[in-house]
Amino acid sequence: ESAASKRKKKEGESDRSVHKVTMEMANEYLQIIDWSAGKTAFATMLCILSPIVLLMLGAMSEMPNYHISENAAAGIGICVLIVLIAIAVTIFILCGMKTKKYEYMEKEDIETAYGVSGMVKEKRDAYHSPYVTQLVIGITCCICSVIPLFGTLAVSESDFYMVSAVCMLLTLVAIGTYFIVRSAAKMNAMNQLLEEEDYTRQKKHENKKMSGPVMVYWLIATAIYLAWSFTTNDWDRTW
């Protein structure tokens, strides 16, 4: 009897369906994640960066020396925002279609073939140092992103400089998010194959039980927000 089967019986899950994962499947899954991780991170970064042009042009339109009308600033800024969001959504869809084949890795119980766990552990050990480095860079960028904003508050009250500081904040957050998403995607894939960290069988089953109530909660919260906002027409406060 394999170790995976013993573990399955020990956890009292013999009646649950278990997906078999061969060495070939594990390697293919890791290759797909390696291919999509950077692209997904880049798309996420584009979403965060998308309003920067709109914000900057809006601030520049308030400055007479830039000779940019509000309509031109809004038109160009919104066009850039839509294009960047469209590119990001396209990337998300392509990556989602590529990884859909193995989406059960995150939510369902799996049983790996002989040698798979050892192979994945070796890859995870080799990736640990780059993972920590990227995570530290990402978190540091996110923490430091508020420095331009508070620095500007300390030395100037100009709206233009404040908007510029917000744009710098978004840029640093985007860079940090890129490193965090990229590194986390690869590490999570290996943890999924090993059923460790956030992907143990117990946590998978707990997440399944919680998914229904969480969805209901957000639907109710959204309905209350929209009803309140439409009723009072006080959108600048209800959010």
Residue spans of the language-model regions?
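Hydrophobic alpha-helical bundles in membrane proteins
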Residues: D15-W239
